[in-house]
Amino acid sequence: MSWSRVIAYGLLPGLALALTCGAGLLKWQDGAVRDAAVARAESVRAATDGTTALLSYRPDTVQHDLESARSRLTGTFLDAYTQLTHDVVIPGAQQKQISAVATVAAAASVSTSADRAVVLLFVNQTITVGKDAPTTAASSVRVTLDNINGRWLISQFEPI
């Protein structure tokens, strides 16, 4: 058997197969990296928007504001938030004319998978009680989100 036949019928097809497999592996890895980057960006955005909604309200619209924020929550945190807002926050805001405006100064992804993410937020909140001068507080919050039906929902909210 001649070497040209060995190369033509053995080595070249094997090399082509190896290159095809390598290209497929690289394509798969590229897709996984892109999916992770998208999940990271979406979860940070959801944590930022959700935190702003959870911590911002005006006395005349507090019920609507905080009820709307509930759509960004899930699990036991949804239950705890609902109880706290109905029992404490809404009545207090209406009686004492309390308004709050929260802004996220910085946000960073701590960890992200396809169905769960943890985001660290640095939050500034300005609170006004009646006609008193506003007070500002800064805090750090660790937000855990679950990806449910394609939506990132807050499942834990831990001040740190």
Curated annotation (Swiss-Prot):
The keyword Kinase does not apply. Residues 1-22 form the signal peptide. This is Outer membrane protein MT2024.1. It is found in: Cell outer membrane. GO terms for cellular component: cell outer membrane. Coiled coil: none annotated. The keyword Membrane applies. Disulfide bonds: none annotated. Keywords: Cell outer membrane, Membrane, Signal.
